[in-house]
UniProtKB/Swiss-Prot annotation:
This is Neurotoxin Nk-3FTx. The keyword Disulfide bond applies. GO terms for cellular component: extracellular region. Possible voltage-gated potassium channel (Kv) blocker. Decreases amplitude of compound action potential and conduction velocity in toad sciatic nerve. Has only mild anticoagulant activity even at a concentration of 5ug/ml. Shows no cytotoxicity towards human cell lines. Disulfide bonds join 3-24, 6-11. One of its GO terms (molecular function) is potassium channel regulator activity. Expressed by the venom gland. It comes from Naja kaouthia (Monocled cobra). Keywords: Blood coagulation cascade inhibiting toxin, Disulfide bond, Hemostasis impairing toxin, Ion channel impairing toxin, Neurotoxin, Potassium channel impairing toxin, Secreted, Toxin, Voltage-gated potassium channel impairing toxin.
């Protein structure tokens, strides 16, 4: 199945697909330069 982008206001910009389900989670650490 296809995973759609998660709303930024709901969960950060990170998302993963498991068993065809969409799971969102916030970013815990910032990107390193």
């Amino acid at each position: 199945l296809t995973c759609l982008n998660c709303p930024e206001m709901f969960c950060g910009k990170f998302q993963i697909c498991r068993n065809g389900e969409k799971i969102c989670f916030k970013k815990l650490h910032q990107r390193r330069p």
